[in-house]
Design a protein with these regions (language model features):
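Short histidine-centered catalytic/ligand-binding loop motif
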Residues: 28-33, 144-166, 292-308, 360
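Short amphipathic alpha-helical segments
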Residues: 32-40, 44, 161-172, 306-315, ...
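Conserved short secondary-structure elements within globular domains
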Residues: 118-128, 181-186, 327-335
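A conserved active-site cap/scaffold subdomain adjacent to cofactor or substrate pockets
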Residues: 136-174, 178, 228-263
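Beta-rich nucleic-acid/ligand-interaction surfaces
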Residues: 58-87, 182-207, 332-341
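A carboxyl-terminal module marker
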Residues: 194-384
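Short secondary-structure junctions
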Residues: 48-59, 177-185, 319-330, 376-381
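Class II aminoacyl-tRNA synthetase-like tRNA-binding/catalytic domains
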Residues: 1-142, 148, 210-224, 231-232, ...
Length: 384
């Protein structure tokens, strides 16, 4: 069932979801087969269908889970500490005191384990308050994978349960990397995630650089126990579809994934399992940017949440709500503290650029005026 505006934007003091964000809910770009995200999703799914399920036990695929989840699903069930920075309203979209827009597809992990699923992928849109630039967007798409093992499997291999699960995990994901990138050099880097131990990130050498492909690890036993399988072991991984698609298809700006411009959409027509690796984005006319600076004094008692108590995520959210996808980048270009008055000044440069037409100073000035008014009213700053 489709979510309505009242399901996501509520008259609740904790709600920080804008109409701009709500309008992305239910778009489901990963469902579009002739779209870079849909193409990549299909390629990954094909790998797990044909390369992994060799013992007759296929992976289940879930790609239509509602993005509003309980706070416990998003954090507690994944063993994320109560004081973790990601719980801040500076980083997470809260619907009310009980629910959020999911920050990761891992929010459905325990739910699927409790339902008896032991091999599955979850795909969907996820939401995070973040900075604005060519590689960051408040809505993106993730894929979560889980595989559970019975004791008989590691006993037959004569291995310790953790070592067995880790070996199976790395073999599976190295195969996925080869499926996507070809015969590339790979390396494993130790990492930390609250819900896996040991944890690692897989990197591939592609296009002359090391690229982080995914994060993964052996699932923490507490999660399996809560899921009803204390005697079993499991691995889990997660990856961002946009991050990989930008590299594989040479897409330079993350906003392009949301474009309805036919010059973008027609480039992916006819994509299939035999030709998708040859597809590359062909740039069309890049219209000039319009730059606007905004300088302001921060209030002395500012509390913007998060570990750094930075205004940036809140400011970016507000600017995006006003300017939508015309906003290309928001960048802090100057910061100083005046010792005489004890105040700190920030100056941000906002880059506006349309993918489809030239912008006029008049229309951007109107957006900028609205933004300035809202910044004063909502963030309590003093414009300079």
């Amino acid at each position: 069932m489709a979510l309505t505006r009242s399901d996501v934007i509520k008259a609740h003091p904790r709600n920080n979801v804008s109409d701009y964000i709500f309008n992305k809910v239910g778009v489901n770009l990963h469902h579009r087969r002739e779209h870079p995200l849909g193409i990549l999703r299909t390629a990954i799914q094909e790998y797990f269908e044909t390369k992994v399920a060799t013992d007759g036990k296929p992976f289940a695929f879930f790609d239509d889970m509602a993005p509003v989840v309980r706070i416990e699903q998003n954090f507690d069930e994944l063993l994320i500490p109560k004081d973790h920075v990601s719980r801040s309203s500076n980083d997470t979209y809260y619907v009310d005191d009980d629910t959020v827009l999911r920050c990761h597809t891992s929010a459905h992990q325990l739910e699927k384990l409790k339902a008896g699923n032991e091999r599955f992928l979850v795909m969907g849109d996820v939401y995070r308050r973040d900075t604005i630039d060519a590689t960051h967007y408040p809505v993106f798409h993730q894929m979560e994978g889980v595989r559970v093992f019975d004791p008989s499997e590691w006993e037959a291999a004569g291995m310790d349960s953790t070592a067995f699960a880790e070996q199976e995990l790395k073999n599976t994901l190295e195969g996925l990397a080869r499926h996507l990138f070809g015969d590339v050099e790979m390396r494993w880097v130790d990492a930390y995630f609250p819900f896996t131990e040991p944890s690692a990130e897989l990197e591939v050498f592609y296009g002359g650089d090391w690229l982080e492909v995914l994060g993964c690890g052996v699932m923490r036993q507490e999660i399996l126990t809560e899921g009803g399988s204390p005697e079993k072991r499991a691995w889990a991984f997660g990856l961002g579809l946009e991050r990989l698609a930008m590299v594989l298809f040479e897409i330079p700006d993350i906003r392009l994934f949301w474009s309805e411009d036919e010059r973008f959409l027609k480039q992916w027509k006819g994509a299939n399992e035999s030709n998708w690796r040859d597809l590359r984005f062909k740039s069309f006319s890049k219209y000039p940017a319009v730059f606007k600076d905004m300088a302001f004094w921060l209030p002395e008692d500012a509390d913007y949440g998060g570990e750094s108590n930075s205004i940036e995520n809140n400011l970016c959210e507000l600017i995006k709500d006003v300017g939508g996808d015309l906003v290309e980048e928001v960048k802090l270009i100057d910061e100083f503290t005046n010792p005489k008055i004890g105040k700190t000044s920030n100056c941000y440069r906002i880059s506006y650029r349309s993918m489809e037409r030239s912008l006029t100073n008049e229309e951007i000035n109107a957006l900028q005026d609205t933004t300035r008014d809202r910044v004063v009213e909502e963030l309590k700053v003093e414009l300079r």
